[in-house]
Amino acid sequence: MMLLRAGSLAAHPAARWWILFGLWLVYGSFGLVVVSIAPLVAPIQQELSMSHTAIGSIMGAWQLVYIGAAIPCGMLLDRIGGRLALLLGVALVALSVLGRALAVDYFTFLLAVMVFGLGGPIISSGAPKMVAELFSGSQRGLAMGVYMTGPALGGVIALALTNSWLMPLLDMQWRWVMGVWAVCALLAGVIWMVIAWLYVPAATPVATNAARPSQLATMLELVRMPAVQVLLVMSTGVFLFNHGLNNWLVELLRHGGMSATTAGYWATLPTLVGIVASLVLPRLATPERRFLILGALCIAALLACVLLRFQDPVPLTAGLLVQGLARATLMTVLILTLVELPGIGEARAGVASGMFFSAAEIGGVLGPLGIGVMFDLSGGFDSSLNALAVVASLLALGCVVLKRLANAPQR
């Protein structure tokens, strides 16, 4: 195997697919750990004496850290390159889930989850930056769809195996389940280290300091762009919808009468749909079709909020299907739109992605926390679904505004 030199990534088709595989594994461990709490809410609440509001605050804790860490992590990524940055990111993910296994109360569990907020932005900003460097055109959309199946599959594994297999196998000890996920994250890190050292250059060449603006100047320039402003607001709404339902879906289904194991299986349905959607829709979302697809995904999110309140299998299944369609691809298409906006480009992709996720994770905090608070106040999930339906409607309106701004002539 040949070690690639800086600037030669895109010239070696086989190597870039190996790198994409490494990104897929790293992002898969990210998704695995993100979902790891959802199927274990009941035993964690019981052992650590937590309310729904408390567990909701824990679910949103890493996103709160993420808000402050995303932009610095994007800068770090641009400075040291994806090879080292992504290795650091997956190591922090493994440390976070290991800390959860060792937590003794609310505050130690909260601290362990917050560590994930340091590693998460490195991974979620690094993956689109590397894909933007490696692929172009419709292949870029396909590659983004491929690596986004990683966290989706990680979520399927956590939801499907936790209560049906791992908990019985490990004597119903949720801490040991967290330990298993820590080992999985470490293995993903080792594999990425091997692939990265074989194929990824130590650092991407950059212009001299005299020739390139500061990161702060770049951020200020980007945030003054009206299309970027709208896109950042939309990212908040998308993550509010995604993180809210991702974290509470198993409990929502259990509240409707399912057992923990059955709810875990049903909760995998949106993720399985999302895997297929991630492979198909981003590739179809070329500039001429992108905003039509984005608007349709927002309508799908709205339909999910309406249908998930039913206990009858037919509307419930339909709700889970459209939820999976929306949650798996809304973020991908938005990021694709961001990195291809005039004035962004590959050179600014790291900072732009950091800004995207920093804004988006405001919704990532509000989603899980808000649903937990609303449950404690109302005793159910209907009020939360109503609120998410309003968010989805506003996202659809945002698509119209974003299309007009993105297609406006550049001055």
Feature-to-residue mapping (PLM):
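Cytoplasmic helix-loop-helix junction between adjacent transmembrane helices
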Residues: 112-150
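Residue-level signature of mid-helix packing/kink "hotspots" within the transmembrane helices
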Residues: 35, 63-71, 156, 271-279, ...
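Helix-loop-helix hairpin linking two adjacent transmembrane segments in secondary transporters
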Residues: 146-197
